[in-house]
C-alpha cells in the first residue's frame, strides 16, 4: 500500500513539474520554439501531405489524420527542454552540472530531454509497469530549477539573484 502511494505521489510530482515547465514554455515562446530550416521544411511538407490526405478521406481515418496534423505542429518536450537549456543554462546550468557531478554523471541536455519525455509519457499514459528511468529523478530536480528560473525571469529578476534564490530555496550550498 505504501509503495502504491509512493508511486502515485511520484507520478503526480513528475507530471506536475513537467506540466509547469510546459506552461512556462507557452508563455516564453508563444509561437513555438525556434526550429532549424530543415525541420521547418520537413514539417511544412508533412503538414501539406496530411492536409491533402485529410481532404480526400472521411470517417475515422480523417479523425486520425487530423490528430496527426496537430502533432506535427506542436513542439516535443525534448525539443522544448533543449531550447530552454540553450537559452537559459547560464542561470541554472551550474546547479545541474553540480547535481550530476555528485552522482558521477555528465549533464547532457539532449539525453535529459529524452529521459524526461519518455518517463513523463510512461506516467501520463499509465505505463506504470515500465521500469523507472533512475537518472530522470536528477533530471526532474534540475527541471524544478529550470521552472523556478523561468518564473523568476518572467518577473524581471536578475540572473544572479535567481541563482542565489535557487541556492537558498533548494539548499544547494554552491559558491556563486
Regions found by a protein language model. Give the residues of each.
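Amphipathic, oligomerization/interface secondary-structure segments
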Residues: 1-176
Amino acid at each position: 500500500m505504501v509503495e502504491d502511494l509512493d508511486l502515485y505521489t511520484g507520478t503526480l510530482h513528475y507530471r506536475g513539474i513537467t506540466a509547469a515547465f510546459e506552461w512556462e514554455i507557452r508563455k516564453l515562446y508563444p509561437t513555438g520554439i525556434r526550429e532549424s530550416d530543415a525541420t521547418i521544411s520537413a514539417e511544412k511538407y508533412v503538414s501539406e501531405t496530411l492536409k491533402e490526405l485529410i481532404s480526400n478521406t472521411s470517417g475515422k481515418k480523417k479523425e486520425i489524420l487530423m490528430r496527426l496534423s496537430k502533432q506535427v505542429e506542436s513542439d516535443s518536450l525534448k525539443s522544448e527542454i533543449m531550447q530552454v537549456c540553450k537559452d537559459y543554462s547560464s542561470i541554472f546550468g551550474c546547479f545541474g552540472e553540480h547535481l550530476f557531478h555528485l552522482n558521477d554523471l555528465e549533464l547532457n541536455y539532449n539525453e535529459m530531454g529524452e529521459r524526461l519525455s519518455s518517463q513523463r509519457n510512461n506516467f501520463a499514459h499509465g505505463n506504470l509497469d515500465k521500469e523507472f528511468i533512475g537518472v530522470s529523478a536528477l533530471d526532474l530536480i534540475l527541471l524544478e530549477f529550470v521552472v523556478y528560473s523561468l518564473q523568476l525571469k518572467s518577473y524581471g529578476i536578475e540572473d544572479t539573484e535567481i541563482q542565489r534564490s535557487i541556492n537558498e530555496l533548494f539548499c544547494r550550498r554552491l559558491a556563486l
